[in-house]
Amino acid sequence: PRSTHCISSAASDVYKRQIDTAHGHTKKVGDAIKKIKKLRPKKTAICAGNIATEEGAKFLVGLGVDIIKVGIGPGSICTTRLVAGIGVPQLSAILNVKKGIGKSKTRLIADGGIKFSGDIAKALAAGADAVMIGSLFAGTDEAPGKKIKKNGKLYKYFRGMGSIGAMNKGSADRYFQSKQKDTSKYVAEGVEGYIKYKGGVDKIIYNLSLIHI
């Protein structure tokens, strides 16, 4: 699984470490968490995922993670459910994981499936503490990629983490394919494409901020 870390701003001395993989309920993930907990500074927050089941939540909570990422295949350009035949509707996944978390203080992030502002409200109402958004922000000035003009309209390139393009840039380990030396044999679980240019992200954030629960 991919492991990333960062040090927060000077206002806080808490370290963050993330275990990021397409299937977070595995022995490899468990071993990685145990290793980090053994080596980490005392003030280190661990985020792990992704999962979609009550059992997966109990597994990660039992290992002492602070944050769990929820979502197997809900992304707009993710093809895991088609390629691997595995996935759980995002709202059901959030409810499952929330049940598994129980009374522990572990936080829940809904990763994917946010296509409209109402999806944020549903995710939070179901038990998520935060959401991760990709496609809604894709095509904005702040998103990576150059603007391209096609048939008189502006577009921006974007891709899923499981796409061949992303795997060639380092995301293959997230899908357990890092040992595959022949990149032509990568099995994609995401696609690449173009999305209509949307301008500044501030307009989108303003519309999303009007949600009240």
Question: Would you name each region that the model predicts?
Answer:
Residues D13-K16, P74-L82:
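Gly-rich Lys/Arg/Thr-decorated short loops/hinges at beta-loop-alpha junctions or inter-strand turns
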Residues G62-D66, G85-A110, I114-I211:
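Alpha/beta catalytic cores of nucleotide-metabolism and tRNA/nucleoside-modifying enzymes
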Residues K16-H25, A45-N50, G71, G87:
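Catalytic beta/alpha-barrel core
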Residues K28, I46-A57, G112-S117:
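Active-site glycine- and acidic-residue-rich loops that bind
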Residues T21-G24, I51-T53, I72-G75, G113-I114, ...:
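Short, ordered loop/turn segments at secondary-structure junctions
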Residues L39-A52, I101-D111:
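Short beta-strand/loop segments at the ligand-binding rim of alpha/beta enzyme cores
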Residues P1-A11, Y15, H212:
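Single conserved hydrophobic/aromatic residue that forms the stacking wall/gate
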Residues A22-R40, E54-K58, I77-L95, G145:
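Active-site-adjacent beta->alpha loops and helix N-cap segments on the catalytic face
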